[in-house]
Amino acid sequence: MKNIADIRQEYTKSGLRESELPCDPLSLFSRWLQEAIDANVEEPTAIIVGTVSPEGRPSTRTVLLKGLHDGKFIFYTNYESRKGRQLAQNPYISLSFVWHELERQVHIEGTAAKVSPEESDEYFRKRPYKSRIGARISPQSQPIASRMQLIRAFVKEAARWLGKEVERPDNWGGYAVTPTRMEFWQGRPNRLHDRFLYTLKTDGKWEINRLSP
């Protein structure tokens, strides 16, 4: 294996200037996300979600962004999963988007709250049939005996809903993340990257600061 310490890449594709920054970070995020989609970035809506246990132990996993409404980031998951249990006790959350092809990252901190059951129902109905069945039978984050256990449960549940509308289970739904800090990172040559931090103030306006790389 190649020496890991020798692996590096020079970032040269773009820059981020103060004059380009809108007052609202959601506007810049939407533009960057669209540019990632237009550039055919693999999984442009992938989010690294960070939560914390009651003991202060962090954990991360990757989910997909499924909406950006009223300034909130929306994703869906099993409420009984590890992240769901942690968010029930501590709503503080971090989200990270990494678009390697564009040499860009966005890091978000905020609080998460469940979306309404009606909103979760609406999205659940849009999911592929087999994904809906899978959501009903998977005890997410829990130990299982084998993959065959999942397959058997899937086949049994699919037969139960044959010819019927698959209902959303109560333990599955969405979270809306309200951001309070958003950092935009653009790779630059010589590791002199551009970093800008938006911080939400008590008056509802965003303060913008350039950070040292």
UniProtKB/Swiss-Prot annotation:
<feature type="binding site">
    <location>
        <position position="82"/>
    </location>
    <ligand>
        <name>FMN</name>
    </ligand>
</feature>
<feature type="binding site">
    <location>
        <position position="66"/>
    </location>
    <ligand>
        <name>substrate</name>
    </ligand>
</feature>
<feature type="binding site">
    <location>
        <position position="123"/>
    </location>
    <ligand>
        <name>substrate</name>
    </ligand>
</feature>
<dbReference type="InterPro" id="IPR012349">
    <property type="entry name" value="Split_barrel_FMN-bd"/>
</dbReference>
<dbReference type="InterPro" id="IPR019740">
    <property type="entry name" value="Pyridox_Oxase_CS"/>
</dbReference>
<feature type="binding site">
    <location>
        <position position="195"/>
    </location>
    <ligand>
        <name>FMN</name>
    </ligand>
</feature>
<keyword id="KW-0664">Pyridoxine biosynthesis</keyword>
<dbReference type="GO" id="GO:0010181">
    <property type="term" value="F:FMN binding"/>
</dbReference>
<feature type="binding site">
    <location>
        <position position="105"/>
    </location>
    <ligand>
        <name>FMN</name>
    </ligand>
</feature>
<dbReference type="InterPro" id="IPR019576">
    <property type="entry name" value="Pyridoxamine_oxidase_dimer_C"/>
</dbReference>
<feature type="binding site">
    <location>
        <begin position="191"/>
        <end position="193"/>
    </location>
    <ligand>
        <name>substrate</name>
    </ligand>
</feature>
<feature type="binding site">
    <location>
        <position position="131"/>
    </location>
    <ligand>
        <name>substrate</name>
    </ligand>
</feature>
<comment type="similarity">
    <text>Belongs to the pyridoxamine 5'-phosphate oxidase family.</text>
</comment>
<comment type="subunit">
    <text>Homodimer.</text>
</comment>
<feature type="binding site">
    <location>
        <position position="185"/>
    </location>
    <ligand>
        <name>FMN</name>
    </ligand>
</feature>
<dbReference type="InterPro" id="IPR011576">
    <property type="entry name" value="Pyridox_Oxase_N"/>
</dbReference>
<dbReference type="GO" id="GO:0008615">
    <property type="term" value="P:pyridoxine biosynthetic process"/>
</dbReference>
<feature type="binding site">
    <location>
        <position position="127"/>
    </location>
    <ligand>
        <name>substrate</name>
    </ligand>
</feature>
<comment type="pathway">
    <text>Cofactor metabolism; pyridoxal 5'-phosphate salvage; pyridoxal 5'-phosphate from pyridoxine 5'-phosphate: step 1/1.</text>
</comment>
<comment type="function">
    <text>Catalyzes the oxidation of either pyridoxine 5'-phosphate (PNP) or pyridoxamine 5'-phosphate (PMP) into pyridoxal 5'-phosphate (PLP).</text>
</comment>
<keyword id="KW-0560">Oxidoreductase</keyword>
<feature type="binding site">
    <location>
        <position position="83"/>
    </location>
    <ligand>
        <name>FMN</name>
    </ligand>
</feature>
<keyword id="KW-0288">FMN</keyword>
<dbReference type="InterPro" id="IPR000659">
    <property type="entry name" value="Pyridox_Oxase"/>
</dbReference>
<dbReference type="Pfam" id="PF10590">
    <property type="entry name" value="PNP_phzG_C"/>
</dbReference>
<feature type="binding site">
    <location>
        <begin position="8"/>
        <end position="11"/>
    </location>
    <ligand>
        <name>substrate</name>
    </ligand>
</feature>
<protein>
    <recommendedName>
        <fullName>Pyridoxine/pyridoxamine 5'-phosphate oxidase</fullName>
        <ecNumber>1.4.3.5</ecNumber>
    </recommendedName>
</protein>
<feature type="binding site">
    <location>
        <begin position="140"/>
        <end position="141"/>
    </location>
    <ligand>
        <name>FMN</name>
    </ligand>
</feature>
<dbReference type="GO" id="GO:0004733">
    <property type="term" value="F:pyridoxamine phosphate oxidase activity"/>
</dbReference>
<feature type="binding site">
    <location>
        <begin position="61"/>
        <end position="66"/>
    </location>
    <ligand>
        <name>FMN</name>
    </ligand>
</feature>
<keyword id="KW-0285">Flavoprotein</keyword>
<feature type="binding site">
    <location>
        <begin position="76"/>
        <end position="77"/>
    </location>
    <ligand>
        <name>FMN</name>
    </ligand>
</feature>
<dbReference type="Pfam" id="PF01243">
    <property type="entry name" value="PNPOx_N"/>
</dbReference>
<comment type="pathway">
    <text>Cofactor metabolism; pyridoxal 5'-phosphate salvage; pyridoxal 5'-phosphate from pyridoxamine 5'-phosphate: step 1/1.</text>
</comment>
